[in-house]
Design a protein with these regions (language model features):
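Short coil/turn segments at secondary-structure boundaries
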Residues: 177, 192-195, 212-215, 314-316, ...
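Residue-level detector of short coil/turn "hinge" positions at structural boundaries
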Residues: 29-30, 187, 423-424, 449-453
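Structured C-terminal cores of nucleic-acid metabolism proteins
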Residues: 411, 440, 444-644
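Conserved, well-folded catalytic cores of nucleic-acid-processing
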Residues: 25, 88, 103, 107, ...
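Charge-lined substrate channels and their catalytic hotspots, especially those that engage the 3′ end
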Residues: 1-247, 251-297, 308-310, 326, ...
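Feature marking long nucleic-acid-engaging regions of large polymerase/nuclease enzymes
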Residues: 138, 223-435, 449, 496-514, ...
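Alpha-helix initiation and N-capping motif
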Residues: 2, 97, 159, 173, ...
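Flexible loop/turn segments at secondary-structure boundaries
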Residues: 170, 229, 252-254, 387, ...
Length: 644
């Protein structure tokens, strides 16, 4: 049913018989119109799910995207989080309002909860809706007592029985499974899917005909040091000034409509945790046959990009043999110390392209923006607790890969523009609205960064970061600017990418971990290598596919964020009653303090005192909640001197 409801956003020619009563006499009668022999959802109506946060219900659309998730009004108290509902949307300057109209489908009759004692009885408390009435289970109190304290369980709501035990909430090793389960991420692949993956994994590159042999070219991959799924490799021919970008040809191993394809599409993206990955494809493919491992012949789609004429980039089906799998740290050491065990031709390729990449980046930033994302990498011990946190910043090695990938992605977007008249699978990013811009100006004013009169939004962002660098506030200001942006989205129609400054852009370079790239590969291969017979069919499904991918992208981010929040809450429990230097990050309903010693750990403080953003304080951690993933504390002192 969910597939049918999503199709109403884009128009459906015929209403399937089982759903006809919904349209003719049922809850969808007032919400659906017929236009040019297609049925569409009327303007102002939306279908989606409920997401609870801090006792408020938010609306998550199946296909539409809002700057902020609409707040649901008049929702009946009995509704479960995973129910599909029809809403009327009313736009507002701050946040859209969703008025509940009808329930369409209870997607699942299970719920994640934890066991706790209330009124001398062990009951189940819903994880996402802990404010609701506890669930009394059919199991005997004696049997429930045998389970660990605060045991996390999956409950069959119809039977009021436990269907799965995840483990004790206090056990840090539960966190991966818990975050995945809370957002209904399927963890395991079906037997059919695993068998099919194993079959394709046994095929050799030599089994595939009509491919260009690139195995003489010394490609290199550059990834995080713990990476195992190598999507892309590069080589720069200095003499010809041609950049070669090779990307794993995953579509050869994942037939359209096969169990492999269906399960990859359901996942949409790989989920990454600090010590593990839950891949979009089975490991035999994602870390095996598709991964561009050194000294292994692999199928690849290879771009040859002449840097003197980017419009003449050409895409080929090839066989490659990567010369080296390297980590960013290794390449950075080589670029700074000019010492490496890499072959000379690889060294020359990297040094030659670095010069080009830095120039490309400089030119790109005249129209695009460098968001200076400071990524916090968590290192966990064997018990699943945070051992240390490292802040990772962009380096020359990152620039090398980033600029090469941007060129390949742009080249792919150009093919869509040229051959499909601006239709396909695009990656788009809208400029913030005037309201969003004003809010950012106000927040930066608190940081004593003022917007000069008549300065446009884009020049002001650069101006703000320049001042932030001088004030040593680059991290804080970058965080504010990133928060002010719209989400980048997938679109079936060409739109610009504000952040990058590109008129046209797509995702091509990560087909092992993103279904969007895999789908784009199929479209481009059909166009270039198969007489374009299936292009119209593939294009027809892109509106629905892009809507799915946008929802799955959001879900993946929520899973990863939920995991990190709970890890920080666990860390805070080890630091109770201890005091730390911190800086005020936000002043809203309370004060949010970021710790200097544990970067990324945010402490919520309820206080009647007035604090300003960037004020240096001493904060004591008083409480942490593993269910909400929140940390509370109290400010014990204002620090006058500068905290470096």
């Amino acid at each position: 049913m969910q597939g049918f409801l999503r199709s109403l956003f884009f128009g459906v020619k015929k209403i399937p018989k089982p759903f006809a009563p919904l349209i003719e006499k049922g809850v969808l009668k007032e919400a659906v119109r017929c236009n040019k022999e297609r049925y569409f959802l009327k303007e102002g109506f939306d279908i989606g799910k409920i997401e609870w946060a801090e006792n408020k219900a938010f609306f998550i659309s199946l296909a539409k995207n809002y700057p902020k998730d609409p707040l649901i009004k008049n929702l009946p108290p009995s509704f479960k989080t995973d129910a599909l509902i029809l809403c009327k949307i009313e736009c507002s300057k701050k946040r859209p309002i969703a008025f509940f109209k009808a329930a369409l489908l209870n997607a699942d009759h299970t719920m994640i909860a934890y066991l706790a004692k209330k009124n001398n009885q062990i009951v189940a408390i819903p994880f996402k809706e802990s404010f609701k009435k506890p669930i009394l289970l059919k199991h005997s109190q004696r049997s429930l007592l045998e389970l660990p304290r605060h045991c996390v369980v999956k409950i069959d709501l119809k039977k009021r029985e436990i269907s799965e035990i995840l483990g004790a909430l206090e056990d840090p090793l539960i966190d991966e499974n818990l975050s995945l389960s809370l957002f209904d991420r399927i963890k395991d692949f079906s037997k059919d899917c695993l068998n099919l993956a194993q079959h394709y994994a046994q095929l050799k590159a030599s089994d595939f005909k009509n491919r260009i042999n690139y195995s003489h070219i010394p490609f290199i991959t550059i990834d995080p040091k713990d990476a195992k799924d190598f999507d892309d490799a590069i080589f720069y021919d200095q003499e010809k000034r041609v950049l070669f970008v090779a990307v794993a040809d995953v579509s050869e191993f994942v037939p359209k409509h096969s169990s492999l394809d269906k399960e990859a599409r359901i996942r949409g993206f790989s989920v990454y945790f600090p010590n593990s990955v839950y891949p979009m494809l089975p490991l035999s493919l994602s870390q095996g046959a598709c991964s561009l491992k050194a000294f292994e012949k692999r199928l690849a789609l290879v771009y040859e990009i002449p840097l003197d004429n980017l419009e003449n980039a050409r895409l080929f089906q090839g066989v490659i043999e990567v010369r080296a799998n390297c980590a960013y740290e290794e390449i950075n050491h080589f670029l700074s110390a000019n010492q490496s065990s890499l072959d000379k031709d690889l060294q020359q390729s990297l040094l030659g392209f670095l010069e080009v990449a830095l120039r490309l980046k400089k030119e790109r930033l005249k129209k695009g923006f460098n968001f200076n994302s400071f990524e916090n990498k968590l290192y966990l011990n064997k018990e699943g607790r945070i051992e240390k946190i490292e802040t990772q910043k962009e380096s020359d090695a990152h620039t090398l890969i980033e600029e090469a990938m941007l060129l390949a992605n742009q080249s792919s977007a150009n093919l869509l523009d040229k051959h499909f008249h601006n239709k396909g699978i695009y990656r788009t990013h809208k400029e913030p609205s005037l309201e969003q811009q004003k809010r950012l100006y106000g927040k930066l004013f608190d940081y004593e960064i003022m917007r000069p009169k008549n300065m446009g939004f884009f020049p002001f962002l650069e101006h703000a970061l320049k001042i932030a660098k001088e004030k040593k506030l680059e991290r804080e200001v970058s965080r504010l600017i990133i928060k002010s942006q719209n989400l980048a989205l997938y679109s079936p129609m060409q739109e610009s990418h504000f952040g990058l400054g590109f008129a046209s852009y797509t995702h091509f370079t990560s087909p092992i971990r993103r279904y969007s790239d895999l789908a784009l590969h199929r479209l481009l291969k059909e166009l270039l290598f198969h007489q374009a017979k299936g292009c119209s069919y593939l294009l027809e499904e892109t509106p629905e596919l892009c809507a799915e991918l946008n929802a799955l992208q959001k879900k993946t981010a929520l899973i990863e964020r939920d995991f990190v929040k709970r890890k920080f809450a666990r860390l805070a429990l080890e630091l109770l009653e201890k005091e730390f230097l911190g800086v005020v990050l936000e002043v809203k309903d309370g004060v949010v303090v970021g710790l200097k010693e544990w970067v990324g750990l945010k402490v919520l403080v309820k206080t009647n005192k007035v604090f300003k953003p960037l004020e240096k304080v001493c904060v004591k951690i008083t409480h942490a909640d593993l269910v909400l993933g929140q940390v509370w504390g109290e400010i014990t002192e204002r620090i006058k001197e500068h905290v470096s």
